[in-house]
């Protein structure tokens, strides 16, 4: 990895399918970041174990997520792409940070309380200490910036707390990581049924997945929620309509978007025509990503090499951190 650049760390879920919200909310910004930062991007397979995924699915999930990220534009030559479980130093730092974490603060984390409410039959220690493992993911590379969503901001605050506690007790080692601010580049994609963020939607027909077929993309967009049109010129635009225009602005020629915006303002818009235009433009945008990801998944040897090379880069960084941490704590005996 290049020296002199700020270090960025971010995790990629190994469960579920990547969708358009992931692409425009995170992956597209990762692609920009890889030019200017030392980036460590990992597939969070250890984190997924809190939900006890079927072992026979885990490898395929990791390969698929890796392939979709590379197909979207992440360059393994510019970033470290690795599986979390390939870096044993993360597990060791997780253990050390647990000695600086307190039961009371972990139980107060909103995401933990949500999990307890939603899955009371599986309140395991991994769920409770999830923020500690996330902190180890970040601090093991001494990252200074972390792209996180709103639901992860408290976890990042805890990572700063653990860094402060370690530094105060043993000596300066960890920078206090801050959230990466994407500014105007942050795009929030809503579900097609107008019920909230695409990432939170439980309606598969309201979510555009990166592996959707052309026909499924068209079908989903044609079913997207609309209304009867503006009641008067200049009327406020409902969220569901604004979301369609947001999607158009991302994949459609500016002059075409402008024509539909004008039609909306003068109350002549035909949503069916707008959806057909958006559907074709979305197919043209998503199909190359899907096709490249599918091709990559047919070459497991290539993906294995990416993971192996990424792990080597990540371990080189992590080993230095753990060596320094052990020395400061006093557990270097020879």
Name the predicted role of every residue range.
Residues 103-107, 140-147, 252-260, 290:
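Short helix-capping/linker segments at secondary-structure and domain boundaries
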Residues 46, 135-139, 194, 253:
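Short connector loops/turns at beta-strand edges and beta->alpha or beta->beta junctions
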Residues 15, 143, 203-205:
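Short, solvent-exposed beta-strand edge segments and adjacent coil->beta transition regions
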Residues 22, 154, 160-334:
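Conserved nucleotide- and phosphate/pyrophosphate-binding catalytic cores
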Residues 2-136, 294:
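N-terminal Rossmann-like or analogous alpha/beta NTP/dinucleotide-binding catalytic cores
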Residues 114-166, 170, 190:
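Internal, conserved structured core segments that host functional sites
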